[in-house]
Each structure stands twice: as C-alpha cells, then as structure tokens.
C-alpha cells in the first residue's frame, strides 16, 4: 500500500517509520525541509508541498495527517480537498476535538477517519493504540496501515461513526489525568509520611505483580530513578489540559458525574498557583509518556 503522510514531528515520523518497516510505500511532506529530508533518508519518497504529495500518490489516495490540532488541520485540508474524491481516504491522527472531526468529515471530499492515537514516543518501538471513527469501508481499506502503526491487529479498532475515534481518545485522556492524579497523591503520601522510603523501589515492587501495575507506574519508577525520591528540581507546574477540559465539558452536557477526572483537571490548573509533590510527579510523567518539556524550579 502507498500512504501519504503530512506532518513529520515526533508522532508523524513514527507513523512513517512503522509503515515503511511493514513494507509499504510512504510519500512524506512537512513544512520543515529538514524533516522531509530525514524521512527520505529513512526510505520515504519526499514531497515539497501538499500538491506535490498528492501528485505522487495513485488514483485511490490514502493520506495520514499528523499535524497540530486546530487551524493546522483545516489549513491542510483546504490544500488537499481540491485534489480528493470519494474514493480517497484521509486520516486525522492528531488530538482534534470530536465535534471538529464531525464537521471536517461532512465537508471533506474524501472519506474521513478520525484516529485517536495513544502511546507517545514509545510507539516507535511498541506501536500505538488507535481509536478510529468514520466509514467502515475506509477503516477496512486502511487496516494494513493500522496494523503497521498500531501494536498489531488488536491495537486498533473501529469505534463507530465520524467523531467517535476522537471522542474515545478524549475520554482516554480524561482517564489518564485521573490515573496520574491517583499515583501522584499516593506517592505524595509516601514522600511526606512516617517512613523514609525509596520511591523508585516502591514503584518497582508495585510494577511486579501488584493490582495497580501499569505503564504509567513504570514511568513513575523511571522518574524516581532519574530524578530521585524527592523529584529533584522538577517543578509542580503541569502543562496541558485541553482534552481534560473537553472531557469534563462533555460529562456536564451528558449529565454524567466524573469527579475524579474533574478534580485531576482542577489540580492541573491549580499547579499554576502553588506547590505540591503530586503535581511535580504529574509534570515529570508527561515527559515520560509524551516527551513533553519538564518545567524546572529554576526555569
């Protein structure tokens, strides 16, 4: 299969590499000529514009967007749409709001798949978890690509109609917030409690057979190993928050109580005002799973 990939940042480059490794062809474009050259060195066919990328694809075009959510998606679609028809498929693999994905699907000349992507930079080796919404036929058509980009056939699923993939990913991120908050509070109690504990050792022990073992807990272990049990100079300012806000807003609209997700979001916003150990751990965990910049106390 031939796939066009637009957006060659951390996540987009992983898509390119995994699709190439699976034996498919990739045509790659990014606003950064350096990123395009690097993808070409890895085996992708370089394109110097969106129009050039489209010209290099066959009649039934399959195009994966991995650009920042918001205006960048709309701008890219504006460039693409004149070249597309109903036999083509476009995948938005970014963190778009599900309602925006529904709007784009209705306006796009091609079949439009909204694909929630989870796994962070670790997906380069392990593969991603992919939550896909949109036409069933388009999902089926892209299955070989999803198999390559995901952890395997069980690492992706068709969630339903347009918007459902990004909807499920939105809720996934809300759950992620709550899990980070729970781990943060637990380790804060251990750090401030009555025993002098090696928190790396605690996390390592929990990761081997405990009910609460998880990849996030493995990242806690990594954080304590690299920063120390007191987290060193890691600040308690936790960035992000948009997808958690969307989750809480949707819960209010659907009249579904989500107190844990709401409280974790409130703590994240509160991190811009005072200092707590739990938020410092959340700050460091965001580096672990997404390689987001770690705010330091002397920054």
Swiss-Prot record:
Keyword NAD: yes
Complex formation: Homotetramer.
Sample GO molecular function, one term: phosphogluconate dehydrogenase (decarboxylating) activity
Location of the active site: 169 (proton acceptor), 176 (proton donor)
EC number: 1.1.1.343
Keywords carried by this UniProt record: Gluconate utilization, NAD, Oxidoreductase
pH dependence text: Optimum pH is 10.5.
Top-level taxon of origin: Archaea
Disruption phenotype: Deletion mutants do not grow on glucose.
GO biological process, one term: pentose-phosphate shunt, oxidative branch
Protein residues bound to NAD(+): 7-12, 67-69, 95
Residues engaged in binding substrate: 95, 118, 120, 172-173, 177, 268
Function: Catalyzes the oxidative decarboxylation of 6-phosphogluconate to ribulose 5-phosphate and CO(2), with concomitant reduction of NAD to NADH.
Recorded catalytic activity of this chain's protein: 6-phospho-D-gluconate + NAD(+) = D-ribulose 5-phosphate + CO2 + NADH
Alphabetical list of InterPro entries matching this protein: 6-PGluconate_DH-like_C_sf, 6DGDH_YqeC, 6PGD_dom2, 6PGDH_archaea, 6PGDH_C, 6PGDH_NADP-bd, NAD(P)-bd_dom_sf, Pgluconate_DH
Family: Belongs to the 6-phosphogluconate dehydrogenase family.
Keyword Thylakoid (UniProt): no
Pathway the protein contributes to: Carbohydrate degradation; pentose phosphate pathway
Protein name: 6-phosphogluconate dehydrogenase, NAD(+)-dependent, decarboxylating
